[in-house]
């Protein structure tokens, strides 16, 4: 997307490239699922920069890992990484490697190399992502070599795939008509206009090798009010996924895929109903019925 033009409180034109062909849309409603509040930002709306809230990660897979690794213990792998870092055999960043529980029966294992949050919040995000990409991709061969040589379960391992781009956990968010606060999540607060639910812990990936997890009460959940998805500055723009209006801690819970998909469904439903001339209240009622089913 290259342009979003607003006239007063409405976005009237969006310009993008689709397979290198220019595409211009004059929308009645816009649902921004970009993860970066791109439409709102380009249209001049107020946004919040959450790029420094969380560390990014690069996901890759290994093949021919011993399928018994899970029973032998993933903790042993972490201990080996820590010892190698302490002895200077690996860069300190390698201790931030996370293993997704597994491997599968055919020996495929998914790993996440968690990077450090930006040290300079004023650094342009494109420059930061470039630096992260270079750093992470240079470390993967070194990590693989260490695992093959030093951890028995990886003796025959080989690189399977590397994600085409970094996983960015936090980016720009809209300024909404309401804001999901940390206290709303931790207090499992419900809302009469709630359109999505979440129950994942606050999961903060900062400078420590492991995430800081803050859990809700067991079997409880919080609700996200529709106004968190509605731009305060633009009447025909809704945001879903990790770019709706929320505090940093609240978004560290609400950004997970299940909740993100629920906000997308709610935003799309609201947009469709408003195009039909129906009210926001009707959209809330329909979405809440869906949540109860």
Task: Set out the residue ranges of the language-model regions.
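Flavin (FAD/FMN)-binding glycine-rich loop and adjacent Rossmann-like elements that form
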Residues: 1-4, 18-29, 33-292
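Short, hydrophobic/aromatic-rich segments at coil-to-beta transitions
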Residues: 8-14
């Amino acid at each position: 997307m290259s342009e979003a033009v607003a006239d007063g409180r409405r976005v009237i034109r969006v310009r993008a490239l689709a397979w290198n062909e220019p595409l211009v849309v004059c929308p009645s409603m816009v649902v921004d699922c970009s993860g970066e509040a791109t439409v709102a930002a380009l249209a001049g709306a107020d946004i919040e920069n959450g790029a420094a809230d969380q560390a990014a990660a690069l996901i890759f897979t290994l093949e021919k890992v011993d399928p018994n690794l899970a029973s032998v213990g993933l903790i042993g792998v972490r201990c080996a990484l820590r010892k190698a870092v302490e002895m200077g055999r690996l860069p300190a960043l390698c201790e931030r490697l996370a293993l997704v529980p597994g491997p599968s029966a055919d020996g495929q294992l998914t790993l996440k190399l968690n990077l450090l949050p930006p040290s300079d919040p004023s650094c342009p995000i494109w420059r930061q992502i470039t630096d992260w990409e270079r750093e992470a991709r240079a470390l993967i061969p070194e990590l693989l070599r260490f695992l093959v040589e030093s951890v028995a379960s990886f003796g025959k391992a080989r690189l399977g795939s590397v994600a085409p781009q970094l996983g960015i956990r936090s980016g720009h968010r809209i300024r909404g008509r309401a804001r999901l606060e940390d206290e709303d999540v931790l207090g499992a607060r419900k809302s009469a206009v709630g359109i999505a639910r979440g129950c994942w812990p606050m999961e903060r990936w900062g400078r420590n090798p492991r995430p800081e997890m803050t859990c809700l009460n067991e079997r409880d959940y919080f609700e996200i009010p529709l106004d968190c998805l509605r731009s305060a500055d633009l009447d025909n723009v809704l945001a879903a996924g990790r770019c709706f209006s929320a505090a940093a801690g609240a978004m560290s819970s609400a950004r997970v895929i299940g909740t993100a998909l629920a906000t997308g469904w709610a935003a799309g439903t609201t947009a469709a109903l408003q195009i039909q001339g129906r009210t926001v209240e009707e959209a809330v009622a329909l979405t809440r019925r869906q949540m109860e089913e």
